[in-house]
């Protein structure tokens, strides 16, 4: 019986395979206990176009803790602004097997509110 990490990675592989068939820009996220990371990856999957995370110096000054829903919303807003700067409006959301809840949902909602279409 697979443990929770193996199950998450299996879900992530399935999602990435479906997104790869579409050849669209992918908004990939990663969540750790302390931080959240977001990357815009091109359709071929070989190039990171933009990224944002709670490790960026500007955000570290602004946020006392990088592992909160508020921090995730700020990262979502920031990655959406960077995407608009590159002329990207539509992305496929790759939640990396994480449940669409809490910080993952906050990041996605903030990105949508700031102009990204999923």
Swiss-Prot record:
Keywords: Ribonucleoprotein, Ribosomal protein, RNA-binding, rRNA-binding
GO molecular function: 5S rRNA binding; structural constituent of ribosome
A biological process from GO: translation
Pfam families: Ribosomal_L18p (PF00861)
InterPro entries: Ribosomal_uL18_bac-type, Ribosomal_uL18_bac/euk
Keyword Ribonucleoprotein: yes
Organism superkingdom: Bacteria
GO-annotated cellular components: cytosolic large ribosomal subunit
Keyword Cell membrane tagged: no
Annotated coiled-coil segments of the chain: none
Function: This is one of the proteins that bind and probably mediate the attachment of the 5S RNA into the large ribosomal subunit, where it forms part of the central protuberance.
Similarity remark: Belongs to the universal ribosomal protein uL18 family.
Assembly notes: Part of the 50S ribosomal subunit; part of the 5S rRNA/L5/L18/L25 subcomplex. Contacts the 5S and 23S rRNAs.
Protein name as annotated: Large ribosomal subunit protein uL18
Lineage of origin: Bacteria, Pseudomonadati, Pseudomonadota, Betaproteobacteria, Nitrosomonadales
Gene: rplR
């Amino acid at each position: 019986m697979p443990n929770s990490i193996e199950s998450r990675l299996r879900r992530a592989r399935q999602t990435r395979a479906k997104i790869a068939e579409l050849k669209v820009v992918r908004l990939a996220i990663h969540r750790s206990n302390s931080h959240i990371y977001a990357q815009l990856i091109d359709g071929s999957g070989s190039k990171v176009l933009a990224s944002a995370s709670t490790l960026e110096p500007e955000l570290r000054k602004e946020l006392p803790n990088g592992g909160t829903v508020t921090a995730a919303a700020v990262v979502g807003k920031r990655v959406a602004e960077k995407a608009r700067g590159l002329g990207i409006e539509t992305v496929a959301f790759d939640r990396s097997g994480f449940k669409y809840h809490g910080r993952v949902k906050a990041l996605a909602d903030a990105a949508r509110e700031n102009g990204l279409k999923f």
